[in-house]
Amino acid sequence: MIDILGDWKRSHFCGSITAADTGKEVCLMGWVQRRRDHGGLIFIDLRDRQGIAQLALDPDRDPEAHAKAERVRNEYVVAVRGIVSARPEGTVNPKMATGEVEVEVKELRMLNGAETPPFLIEDNVDVAENIRLKHRYLDLRRPALQSNLVLRHKVAQIVRNYLNDTGFIEVETPVLTKSTPEGARDYLVPSRVNPGMFYALPQSPQLFKQLLMVSGFDRYYQIVKCFRDEDLRADRQPEFTQIDCELSFVDRQDIMDIMEAMIATVFQQILGIELSLPMPRITYTESMARFGVDNPDMRFDLELVEISNIAKDCGFKVFADAVKKGGIVKLLNAKQCASFSRKEIDDLTDFVKIYGAKGLAYVKIQEDGSWQSPIAKFFTEKEIALIDEAAGSEPGDLLLFAADTFKVANESLGRLRGHLGQKLGLARKDDFRFAWVTDFPLLEWDGEARRHVAVHHPFTAPLDEDIALLDGDPGSARAKAYDLVLNGSEIGGGSIRIHNREIQNKMFSLMGITAEEAEEKFGFLLGALSYGAPPHGGIAFGLDRLMMILTGSDSIRDVIAFPKTQKATCLLSEAPGAVDDKQLRELSIRRAVRNN
């Protein structure tokens, strides 16, 4: 039989009682973690958001409460009244925050029963993720996930307090907006009152926050939900949360200074870690040269070395031909990895092929300093000496080579560097290394579309000294853009924006957007730029990805209350779902069968 709560009021959380409460009468409420019957005396571990308290039920003290306790099972919801007492000698549990005390129960109310859960409500439970996501309301009872979400709340509060104290104003921007098909695909929402027309869910509040700067708000922020209909991976979701900021009358340095201080405040208050400021700054060109990627993991060395000048005239045709075709040859020195088996090297070769590399040449440095490799015979002693010097080769090292286009050689070896960092245990989760990456290319050439595309977005300003390049050599122009990278993940990215209508029109033109198209898609922005737009810039941080790193989680789904799968489905609510024909008719939509 289920009891009613009645006039009972909780006095303490389960995890908050301590030895200082000994002798006090308390009222606790929560879920039964486990029940143990010791031949008359029954012990219940009662759990809530803050922890676990041990309850002791003695039939001599309250027969009715004891009788109810005999019927409770795991995950039953109960409320108890009792006296906090010190645990008997020898029964103290140092692993529990409440391990010095227990509650001698005088009254118990059984507030609800529970079916047997499909998995134990424990942190180290071994259960398939799809089962956990299907029963997310049970999964979220586990202390680790609750801790992650409580920490997420604290981070959001710290960010808000910092930005409020730094002169920012929180402003909400529209969720139903206009589709601007640059970048990832939009999620579209049909308009019932405007048949045949669609809203788009925002990929970011980009244009609206720029308009707020034109409006004179000076400093804006928002912790905002954004949406992208893109292929997913471990650290991406179709809906995600950004810490979004925009500032007027600033340069890049101002924004980086303010934002790294915000991140330092988060790390100090959450982890007790004092970050060294200013954070390192490297250019995109330097990052690609040293690490092969624009989001380098700075926790370990393994830097890449270009040897194109040595390889261009060597006898190994793969290397020489790559350079002659305008490509590059780079190597990575995996220190003391010459013991890798052929299978391990084959696995590394398969890994780089994911990123377009055709293969992976290797050299093992023997104890006498000589090369052991299928390609050794193609190199002269002088070339070998030059490569060893460039690589810093030592006996026991493994040299790994990529010869391809600039993009493929860098990305394949750069990703391999990150992979080896994990494989060799060089990337500790409790080691936090930041870097600002700056001076990205403004544009890149899309060979398939036969036009330039923005590396970041079309509203990014070029460096002042590169504005002239827009007329003759736009591919060489650099952007006033900056990304904040933490342990190989981009956690934030932004730029100084174009605030001059003429330059914005030029940018659209370089991207193959006609004046008519620009007016149709972005006329409201261009109009605003005609009415005294101030110099401005901003940044957005991925809160989900930041939380993933702060908590040491392997999946972004562990820091989001109700996440989607990698197929963008919600196993709990079974979204997305079908809608009936009546709803579709109201929206002037007709079903079409897709031919796969």
UniProtKB/Swiss-Prot annotation:
PROSITE patterns: AA_TRNA_LIGASE_II (PS50862)
GO biological process, alphabetically ordered: aspartyl-tRNA aminoacylation
Entry keywords, A to Z: Aminoacyl-tRNA synthetase, ATP-binding, Cytoplasm, Ligase, Nucleotide-binding, Protein biosynthesis
GO cellular component, one term: cytoplasm
EC number: 6.1.1.23
Amino acids binding ATP: 228-230, 237, 490, 542-545
Family, per entry: Belongs to the class-II aminoacyl-tRNA synthetase family. Type 1 subfamily.
Function: Aspartyl-tRNA synthetase with relaxed tRNA specificity since it is able to aspartylate not only its cognate tRNA(Asp) but also tRNA(Asn). Reaction proceeds in two steps: L-aspartate is first activated by ATP to form Asp-AMP and then transferred to the acceptor end of tRNA(Asp/Asn).
Protein name: Aspartate--tRNA(Asp/Asn) ligase
Organism annotation: Syntrophotalea carbinolica (strain DSM 2380 / NBRC 103641 / GraBd1) (Pelobacter carbinolicus)
